[in-house]
Design a protein with these regions (language model features):
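Short coil/linker segments at helix-helix boundaries
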Residues: 12-130, 138, 143-153, 166-178, ...
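Conserved alpha-helical positions within TPR/SEL1-like repeat arrays
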Residues: 157-161
């Protein structure tokens, strides 16, 4: 297959990854949520970072609104498993086949890395530390696909720190495995 085919494949997977949350952003007014995403399937009261929140429930995501502003979200399900990982691998294959495709690959991996970092931040704000760490690590890995892109070390630092924080909540072999993973991330 040609590099362009791999870029198209990667873009489809990256777009599918971002789709459930692409209209969301912290600090966006509740009214914009309703205009951009539509009416939720339901709503209920909850807490977000210690504050009272209204949670608007959609098929793929719960959106947390505090004082009329989106503060976070929890993606309940994905369109398909491993979308981001598949997109990263496809972009890498495209670049491997044709290094001249660098500008298209770079644009795609940067968009994906940004979506992953935003999702990681949302997960961290929800207290989902392990999932946030994984998303930050994927954001960093996406940025490494094209050598011309300077991968953001903050993503790797966040991944390592959150992995270590998660490990501190575990016991026995699980804790050891998580600490080792955090150490490996920091070694990169």
């Amino acid at each position: 297959a040609k590099a362009a085919t791999w870029v198209a494949h990667a873009k489809a997977y990256a777009d599918a990854y971002a789709l459930p949350t692409k209209e969301l952003g912290r600090g966006v007014p509740e009214q914009m949520l309703m205009m951009n995403v539509g009416r939720p399937e339901g709503a209920f009261e909850s807490q977000f970072a210690g504050y009272p929140a209204i949670v608007y429930s959609y098929e793929y995501v719960d959106v947390y609104v505090v004082n009329g502003m989106i503060e976070g979200w929890n993606q309940k399900k994905s369109i398909k498993e491993n979308l981001a990982e598949t997109a990263i691998a496809s972009y890498a294959k495209a670049y491997e086949l044709d290094p001249k495709s660098e500008s298209k690959v770079a644009a795609g991996v940067l968009n994906l890395a940004n979506a992953l970092a935003i999702q990681a931040d949302a997960l961290n704000n929800m207290g989902k530390v392990a999932e946030a760490a994984a998303a930050f690590e994927l954001a960093f890995r996406a940025q490494q696909v094209v050598p011309a892109i300077k991968a953001d070390p903050n993503n790797l630092y966040n991944a390592g720190m959150l992995t270590t924080m998660h490990a501190a909540t575990l016991q026995g072999e699980e804790a050891l495995a998580a600490f080792n993973k955090g150490e490996k991330i920091f070694a990169d």
